[in-house]
Curated annotation (Swiss-Prot):
Glycosylation sites: N62
Annotated SMART domains: LRR_TYP, LRRCT
Compartmental location: Membrane
Source organism per UniProt: Homo sapiens
Cellular component terms (Gene Ontology): plasma membrane
One Pfam family from the record: LRR_8
Cysteines joined through disulfide linkages: C27-C33, C31-C43, C238-C264, C240-C285
Gene this chain is encoded by: TPBGL
Record keyword Glycoprotein present: yes
Annotated spans, Disordered: 358-382
Protein name as it appears in the record: Trophoblast glycoprotein-like
Cleavable signal peptide: 1-26
Length: 382
């Protein structure tokens, strides 16, 4: 009976050994597999890879393609769609949760490019020169939580930003959105409408500030916390238009982790000044027709006042040193003043003596005799 009792355990061990002995799915051509194909695939094959590999195992969880020349992501590109854009039936990668497509020269993402990836939670399209983005490019991604588009929207212009608004609209479950390094001059309205967004990365853009409408859109109804905002390395203009942003930052510092790195790019008088160190009441508006000189006349903060105080202290110190020098040399100064007084007195006495000599009538010269008086003088013999 004992051997019979041990048979189930032995059978279980045999089943596990058989499962482990089965050959794993082969790694796709031009790709590297780490920990088995279903864990991580990395495909970095240069310009010869012009479309996603077709032989990715269906149980793959993570797929990375770097350095390829994909150029155009057509509809259902990862679900068996062919080069003509025809979609394949069904889902080829039902378990894929992370897809990284950085540095692949992708210029166009068509509608439905990621169809057939129902489990995809993280998508990274950073560092691709996108020029066109379909309004339905991200449709069919109900589980998407993270979307990275860093350094990918610079070349597209306003049309691409408008398409981005349409493409973001269906991503109701999105938590993280990366838009760093895209020369954005405003926040995408669709990004502000994502109800579950937890973090918005807009660093290294061209944001001169956030207007009151954008700040209101960052707040949630019902007291729910709004998304964190990464805002560093933007050319902020610290004029009167920055007052709402400054007030918002001081009330929600924890929502802007890099708030201490926010610095002014204009006006010139406040160049590289930390925004949080400014006094909102002192931020002035430049005249609409003012030039650079008008900009320099804007907002003088506490540091400028401190410089004036320091200058006054330096002048006071110089005056104190001057008084100390006078005090230490008081005897020499008194001697110099006495000598000067005596010299002046001697000079005045000399002037007075000469004046008296000139005024004495006895010392006046005799008047000259007339010319005709010599003929009748007593000794003339006439």
């Amino acid at each position: 009976m004992a051997p019979r009792a041990g048979q189930p355990g032995l059978q279980g061990l045999l089943l596990v050994a058989a499962a482990l002995s089965q050959p794993a799915a082969p790694c796709p051509f031009q790709c590297y597999c780490f920990g088995g194909p279903k864990l991580l695939l990395r495909c970095a094959s240069g310009a010869e890879l012009r479309q996603p590999p077709r032989d990715v195992p269906p149980d793959a969880r993570n797929l990375t393609i770097v350095g390829a020349n994909l150029t155009v992501l057509r509809a259902a590109a990862f679900a068996g769609g062919d080069g003509d854009g025809d979609q394949a039936a069904g889902v080829r990668l039902p378990l894929l949760s992370a897809l990284r497509l950085t540095h692949n020269h992708i210029e166009v993402v068509e509608d439905g490019a990621f169809d057939g990836l129902p489990s995809l939670a993280a998508l990274d399209l950073s560092h691709n020169p996108l020029r066109a983005l379909g309004g339905g490019a991200f449709r069919g991604l109900p589980a998407l939580r993270s979307l990275q588009l860093n350094h990918a929207l610079v070349r597209g212009g306003p049309a691409l930003l408008a398409a981005l608004d349409a493409a973001l609209a269906p991503l109701a479950e999105l938590r993280l959105l990366g838009l760093a390094g895209n020369a954005l001059s405003r926040l995408p309205p669709a990004a502000l409408r994502l109800a579950r967004l937890e973090q918005l990365d807009v660093r290294l853009n061209a944001l001169a500030g956030l207007d009151p409408d954008e700040l209101r859109a960052l707040e949630r109804d019902g007291g729910l916390p709004g998304p964190r905002l990464l805002l560093a390395d933007n050319p902020l203009r610290c004029g009167c238009a920055a007052r709402p942003l400054l007030a918002w930052l001081r009330n929600a510092t924890e929502r802007v982790p890099d708030s201490r790195r926010l610095r002014c790019a204009a006006p010139r008088a406040l160049l590289d000044r930390p925004l949080l160190d400014l006094d909102g009441a002192r931020l002035r508006c430049a005249d609409s027709g003012a030039d650079a000189r008008g900009e320099e006349a804007e907002a003088a903060g506490p540091e400028l006042e401190a410089s004036y105080v320091f200058f006054g202290l330096v002048l006071a110190l110089i005056g104190l040193i001057f008084l100390m020098v006078l005090y230490l040399n008081r005897r020499g100064i008194q001697r110099w003043m006495r000598n000067l007084r005596e010299a002046c007195r001697d000079q005045m006495e000399g002037y007075h003596y000469r004046y008296e000599q000139d005024a004495d009538p006895r010392r006046a010269p005799a008047p000259a005799a007339p010319a005709g008086s010599r003929a009748t003088s007593p000794g003339s013999g006439l």
